[in-house]
C-alpha cells in the first residue's frame, strides 16, 4: 500500500488534464459533483456510481452498549450513518490490483 491519499485537488487536476477545462472550472466541477452527492445523502437518497459503488445513509435505532473496560452499560442514541457498498467490478479491480 502506497499510503497516498486522493484529494479534491488531485481530482480537479485530473479533470484539468483529461477533460481540458481550466483549473478553476475543473475545481468548480469537482466541488459541484461532491456537493450534489452530499445533498442527496443528507436528504436520505442513495448515490449510485456505476462500476464504483453505492453510498447510502442508514438509520440506527437507540440501543444499550457496554463499556468494554468496565462492563458498564451505556445508552447509545439513535443516529444516521453513512455506508458505502462497492460494486462487484470495483471489488474485483481492487482484489486484482488493476488500474485500468
UniProtKB/Swiss-Prot annotation:
UniProt keyword annotations, A-Z = DNA recombination, DNA-binding, Transcription, Transcription regulation, Translation regulation
An annotated Gene Ontology molecular function: structural constituent of chromatin
Biological process annotations from GO: DNA recombination; positive regulation of metabolic process; regulation of DNA-templated transcription; regulation of translation
**Gene3D superfamilies, per database record:** IHF-like DNA-binding proteins
What the entry lists under SMART domains is as follows: BHL (SM00411)
A Gene Ontology cellular component where this protein is annotated is:
cytosol
- Identify one Pfam family in the record: Bac_DNA_binding
Domain of life of the native organism = Bacteria
Entry-linked PROSITE patterns: HISTONE_LIKE (PS00045)
The signal peptide here is: none
Task: State the family named in the UniProt similarity comment for this chain.
Answer: Belongs to the bacterial histone-like protein family.
Assembly behavior: Heterodimer of an alpha and a beta chain.
Its job: This protein is one of the two subunits of integration host factor, a specific DNA-binding protein that functions in genetic recombination as well as in transcriptional and translational control.
For this entry, the protein name equals: Integration host factor subunit alpha
Amino acid at each position: 500500500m502506497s499510503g497516498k491519499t486522493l484529494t479534491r485537488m488531485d481530482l480537479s487536476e485530473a479533470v484539468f488534464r483529461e477533460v481540458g477545462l481550466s483549473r478553476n472550472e475543473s475545481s468548480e466541477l469537482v466541488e459541484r459533483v461532491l456537493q450534489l452527492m452530499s445533498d442527496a445523502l443528507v436528504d436520505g437518497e442513495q448515490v449510485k456510481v456505476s462500476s464504483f459503488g453505492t453510498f447510502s445513509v442508514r438509520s440506527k435505532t437507540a440501543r444499550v452498549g457496554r463499556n468494554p473496560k468496565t462492563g458498564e452499560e451505556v445508552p447509545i442514541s439513535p443516529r444516521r450513518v453513512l455506508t458505502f457498498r462497492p460494486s462487484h467490478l470495483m471489488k474485483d479491480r481492487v482484489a486484482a490490483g488493476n488500474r485500468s
